[in-house]
Amino acid sequence: MFSRVRGFLSCQNYSHTATPAITLPSSGSANFAGVEYPLLPLDQHTPLLFQWFERNPSRFGENQIPIINTQQNPYLNNIINAAIIEKERTIGVLVDGNFSAGQKKALAKLEKQYENIKVIYNSDLDYSMYDKKLSDIYLENIAKIEAQPANVRDEYLLGEIKKSLNEVLKNNPEESLVSSHDKRLGHVRFDFYRNLFLLKGSNAFLEAGKHGCHHLQPGGGCIYLDADMLLTGKLGTLYLPDGIAVHVSRKGNSMSLENGIIAVNRSEHPALKKGLEIMHSKPYGDPYIDGVCGGLRHYFNCSIRHNYEEFCNFIEFKHEHIFMDTSSLTISSWR
C-alpha cells in the first residue's frame, strides 16, 4: 500500500517544491504590535485532523471510501500518506454525509488498515455547548442598534435583522447557530464544524470513543490540515505564538489568512473562543471571516492601524515538510 500511495503521489506532477530554507520557530517568544507572546509547543503526539463532508455519496461506489481520490485531487491518498509518515500521531478524519452501509464499512476497513487513522462521524459529537438561538442573536442586535443615536443608526440593517427574526419566530423559534449551519451547503458548513471541532481539540477524539486514543490528554490541541496539504516528512514538535497558527495564502504581493491549516495547542483556544463570541454576537456571522480571522485579529489586538502583512507573518503556520494548498495547482473537486 505504501508503494501505491507513493506512486500515486508521484504522478501529480506538481510544478513547485517545498518552500526552501524555512526557519522553524523554537521555544522563546514572538512579538506582535509590541507584545511578546510565548512560543508554546505542540509535541509530536498532537493529533492531526483532516475533514471530508460529502454532499453526494452516490457519486462513489456502494462499498467505496467516500473521499475523493483522483490523480488531480488525491485527497484520500494524502490522508493515508500522512498516516504512514506520522505513525506516532493519531490521524483524525472528520466525516459527514448520508453514507451507505457499505461506505461506512469501507471507512471502518481504512481504520483497520492504518491503526492510527480514526474516522470520526460529525453526528457523534455534541456541539450544544457552542450553540446559541438565532432569535437571541437577532434580539440582542436589534436592541444594540435601537440604542444608537438616530443619526448613526443603520436603519437598513435594523430592518433586515427584524425580518430575519420574524422569519425564525414564524418557522422555527428554536433555530440555532448549529441547526442553521446544518442546513447550509458548501464551504460555510464545512468551515463552521471545523471551528467547533478545533474548539474541542483532543477532547473530540476522546468524546468519540475512538480505540487507541487513550494517550491523548483531555484539553489538548489538534492540527487541522486541508486534504490538499501534502506531507513530505514528520512535523516534529512545533512552537507557535500563544499556541496557535494558521495557513497564510501568498499570491504575488498579496497575502491573506486562510483556514486550510489551523493548529492549536489546547482545546478552547481563546482566539477561537473569541471567534465564536463574534459568531454569537453578529446577526450574519461567517465561520471563516469572523470565526477564524476575526477571532485571531481580536485576540491579538490586530486593528486596522496595524500592518496586516506583519500579522500574517506573525501567525503563519510554516513547515518545510508540507506542500501547501495543492488544489490551487489543479481544480478542487469538493462540491
Swiss-Prot record:
Glycosylation positions in this chain: 153, 184, 305, 335
Impact when changing residue 52 to A: Abolished protein-arginine N-acetylglucosaminyltransferase activity
UniProt PTM comment: Auto-glycosylated: arginine GlcNAcylation is required for activity toward death domain-containing host target proteins.
Gene Ontology molecular function, alphabetical: lipid binding; manganese ion binding; protein-arginine N-acetylglucosaminyltransferase activity; toxin activity
Effect of residue 184 to A: In 4RA; abolished auto-GlcNAcylation and reduced activity toward death domain-containing host target proteins
EC number(s) stated in the UniProt entry for this protein: 2.4.1.-
DXD motif, short sequence motif: residues: 226-228
Family to which the UniProt record says this protein belongs: Belongs to the glycosyltransferase NleB family.
Annotated protein name in UniProt: Protein-arginine N-acetylglucosaminyltransferase SseK3
Native source species: Salmonella typhimurium (strain SL1344)
